[in-house]
Every structure is written in structure tokens, then in C-alpha cells.
A protein has these predicted regions:
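N-terminal low-structure segments adjacent to metalloprotease catalytic domains
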Residues: 1-51, 285-299
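N-terminal short leaders/motifs
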Residues: 3-9, 136-137, 178-187
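Single-residue recognition of alpha-helix capping/boundary positions
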Residues: 5, 65-68, 242
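A short alpha-helix capping/helix-coil boundary motif
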Residues: 7, 26-28, 59-60, 208-212, ...
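Juxtacatalytic substrate-recognition/specificity segment
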Residues: 45-167, 256
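Acidic/His/Gly-enriched intrinsically disordered linker/tail segments
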Residues: 146, 150, 166-299
Length: 299
């Protein structure tokens, strides 16, 4: 498909982090014949759904999704408050939020496989597949937690691109790990991440979609978690304002490496080396603690 595709994988379990896999994609592309076709499909899809406005978001839904409208509005409200502060933007650009009724419809529309949500910058839309509707409708904690996390992730991609338009900046100037890391961090920064990275993928191999897709299968690690931890590390070092600083400095200089150094006061290469040392040490500590736990249990 034309343009770049970004993916984020979230592993969560009610109250803890575990092995449940959830995939969400983000697309941004230039105008193309294929984009025009998708835009036409989007308008046709909207005609078949009901619509309700919430601030700058037009929510398109079928009757079966009416019970989750209040949860959706609540999540959008929280996401907007956080992202307005994060990006220093009123976030007034309109965006469509469209619920898909099943996986086949979503995959047919997006031409993407195994997804539960996506954001298209070209079409200015968020697509969501509310899984486990019965559990969502009943307010079950785990289902609600997952739904809110995915929606916040996608909304953050929308907010990021709004800011880039304000700055007249090219989204492709920012490496994929930064796009995904910011969205993952926004959706999970208030959670406690306790998972250890098996290994750290070089950032030079996480810039483009092609590299990202290759890294998914070429490394025995979680590149989505790595991107989250990279942003978390930056926020701990410099405060959450460093995210906007990097975005603005990169827009001004036209180079992510130059913008990063200006905002962080450290070269990207130096930060990467420091990050790798830290997480290699954490991995070693985790292995030692796991061995001791097993040894004690087996005594």
C-alpha cells in the first residue's frame, strides 16, 4: 500500500502486563490514486452509519456500538486534555472516528491484516474494531482498559500529525520508533511497565516502515516496547516537555538527529548507547532474580 505504515503492539492483562497481543496501525501517505479510492470508500461507509459529534471528532457508529459511545467520549476527552498539553496545540483539526463491525470489513477497507485499529493521516480518520463488545457494553474492566488504551494511542497519532501540520513539518522526518514511541507512551505512561527487553534493536534499523516490518521478524525482541521505553527514558531525563522540544527543534532544523541534540543536549548516538547499556543491565538483573526465585522454589 502507498505510504508508510506504523504498527504498535500492546501486551496487557487485567492489572498486569502479559501475553495478550493487540495490533493497531497508523498510515500516513501522500495523495495518490489509491488514496482517492480509499477516500471514496470512507464516504460510502459513513453514509451507512449514524454520527455524533464530540468536539473536533465525528464518531460514526452502528446501533450495536451505541452502548460504548459514552466510554468513547470519556476516553476522547481524557486523550484530548493530555495531548493538548503534550503538543501545546488546541487540536481543532477535524477527524473522523469510524467503528467497524467486524475484522473482515476493517481489513477490506484498510488493506491491512490482523488489526484492531488504525489512523490514516491522509483520510483524517481513526478506524476502530471494538472487540469483545459484550464485555465492553457491560463495563468489564479488562475490556475497557484495552479499548481506552488503543483509542488513546490512535488519538495521539492524530494529535502528533496536527502539530506537524502547524509546524509545516514532514512526518517522514521523524523516525518510526519516535512516532510509535510517543503514541505508546501517551497511552501507557501512567501504567507500570515491568517487562524486560530481550535485546535492543539499533535505532538506525527502526526509521522506516520497511525496516520496521523487517525488525518485527528479524529480532527476538519487542520493538514496540522498546520504542515506549525510549520515550519513557527521555521523559525521565528531561521531563515530558522534551517530546515537544524534539518535535519543534526537528521541524526547525530539518534533521531529527540535529533536533534531538538541540532538545536533549545529547547526541542521538550517545543516548542510544546509554539506553542500550541500561537495558542490558536490567536484562542481566532480571535473569539473576528469576534464577534465584526458581532456586528458592525448588529447595
Amino acid at each position: 500500500m502507498t505510504g508508510e505504515v506504523k504498527a504498535a503492539f500492546v501486551f496487557m492483562m487485567a492489572g498486569t502486563l502479559s501475553a495478550l497481543l493487540l495490533a493497531v496501525f497508523v498510515m500516513f501517505s501522500q495523495e495518490s490514486p489509491e488514496a482517492a479510492v480509499l477516500s471514496g470508500k470512507k464516504e460510502k461507509l459513513k453514509e451507512s452509519l449514524e454520527m455524533v459529534k464530540y468536539e473536533s471528532v465525528s464518531i460514526y457508529y452502528a446501533e450495536e456500538d451505541r452502548p460504548i459511545l459514552e466510554l468513547t467520549k470519556e476516553t476522547l476527552r481524557d486523550a484530548a486534555v493530555m495531548n493538548r498539553e503534550l503538543f501545546a496545540s488546541p487540536l481543532q483539526d477535524s477527524v473522523d472516528l469510524i467503528f467497524f463491525s467486524n475484522r473482515n470489513d476493517m481489513e477490506s477497507f484498510s488493506k491491512l491484516k490482523d488489526i484492531t485499529g488504525f489512523y490514516s493521516n491522509n483520510m483524517r480518520m481513526i478506524g476502530l474494531l471494538p472487540e469483545e463488545r459484550t464485555h465492553l457494553n457491560s463495563g468489564e474492566g479488562f475490556a475497557v482498559f484495552l479499548y481506552k488504551r488503543v483509542l488513546v494511542h490512535e488519538y495521539t497519532h492524530y494529535a502528533f500529525h496536527v502539530k506537524l501540520r502547524e509546524l509545516n513539518a514532514d512526518p517522514a522526518a521523524y523516525p518510526l520508533w519516535f512516532h510509535e514511541g510517543v503514541a505508546e507512551w501517551a497511552s501507557a505512561h501512567d501504567a507500570i511497565e515491568i517487562r524486560t527487553l530481550p535485546s535492543v534493536v539499533p535505532l538506525s534499523k527502526l526509521k522506516t516502515d520497511r525496516q520496521w516490518q523487517k525488525a518485527r521478524t528479524g529480532y527476538e525482541t519487542d520493538i514496540y516496547l522498546q520504542s515506549y521505553y525510549l520515550i519513557e527514558e527521555l521523559a525521565e531525563k528531561k521531563g515530558r516537555g522534551v517530546i515537544l522540544d524534539i518535535i519543534e527543534e526537528t521541524a526547525e532544523r530539518g534533521s531529527f538527529a540535529d533536533g534531538f541534540k538541540a532538545a536533549v543536549g545529547q547526541s542521538l548516538t550517545g543516548f542510544e548507547k546509554e539506553f542500550k547499556r541500561k537495558y542490558e543491565a536490567k536484562k542481566t538483573a532480571w535473569k539473576v532474580s528469576s534464577f534465584r526465585a526458581v532456586f528458592i522454589i525448588n529447595e
